[in-house]
Amino acid sequence: MSTPLRIVKIYLSIVLLVSAVPNAFGRELPTAQPSRVGMSTERLQRLTDHMHQAVEEGVMVGGLGLIARNGRVVYRETYGQSDREAAKPMAMDNIFRIYSMSKPITSVAVMMLYEEGRFFLNDPIARYIPELANLVVATSTADGQTTAVSDGTTSSTLGEGDESKQGQTRKPLRQPTIRDLLSHVAGFTYGFFGNTEVDKQYRAEQLMQSDDTLEQFVTQLGEIPLQYDPGTRWHYSVSVDIQGRLVEAVAGMRFGEFLETRLFEPLDMKDTSFIVPQDKLDRLAQIYSPEGTQEGSS
C-alpha cells in the first residue's frame, strides 16, 4: 500500500500539522516557577517583551513560546494573532504547519524500523525499492558543468565548454544506500533550487506537483538521472520522500498509517496529522510571508 504524494509532501510544504501545546507531544508537563529550576523570571519577561515588540513592528504576525527545564514548564506565552484578517488572537492550542521539520519525524520512522533489525543502514535502497535499481548519473550538473569519473570514490568536473557531454549519463560509482538518504548525499535533487539539467527534468516531469502515490513517485524518479554520485556531495533533495516509501516497503503499510499507529498514537500526539480535520480548522494558524502577505490555505 502507498500514500498519495500530494499528502506526504510534509517534506516541502503544507501537510504535517502540530499543535504547540505540551500534550501534542505526550502528557502535559507539570509547571514550576522559573527560579525553582535555575531560570530568571526577569529574563523570561525580556523574551516576552521582545516578541510583543516584534509583532508591533510587523516582524511577525503572531507566535507562541514554551520553555521547559528539568521536565517542568516555566514559560508559556502567546504573541500577536493567528489570523490577522479575522483578528483572531494567538492561542496555546493553535495548530501550525511545520513544513520541513517533518523531515526528522520521517527519519524517526526509518530508524524505528532500523532498531527492529529490518535493514542495515548501508543496504542499497534498491534492495527495498526496486524501482530505483537502475539509476544513472547525469554528466551535466550545475550550470552546464559536466562530471566524469576520476577515481573509485569521487567525481571531477569538466569545463562547461565540453558540449559533447551535455545530456549524457553514466553508471554511478556505487548505488545509493539508506544511510545516504538520511544524510542527503544520495545524489538526488529537488528540482526548484537549481537549474541543472536534472533540475530541469524534475520540473518538466512535474515530479513535486504530482498526486501520485509514493510508490508511483519513486517509479517516476527512477527514470531521472542522479545529479551526483552517491556519497560524494551533500545536496538538499527528495531523499526524505524516498524514506517515506522505504517505510511503506519495509513495514507493509501506508506511510501515514505507520506514523499514526507507531508514533503519534503511542505519544498521545492528538493534534498531529497530515490533514487538519474539519472540526479543528478554526485552530489552524495562517501563514504570512516576510512581506506580511497571507500565504497557503487550510
Language-model region placement:
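Short, surface-exposed loop or secondary-structure junction motifs
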Residues: 83, 130-298
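Acidic-enriched catalytic cores of C-N bond-cleaving enzymes acting on peptides and small amides
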Residues: 125
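Hydrophobic or amphipathic alpha-helical targeting/insertion segments
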Residues: 104-118
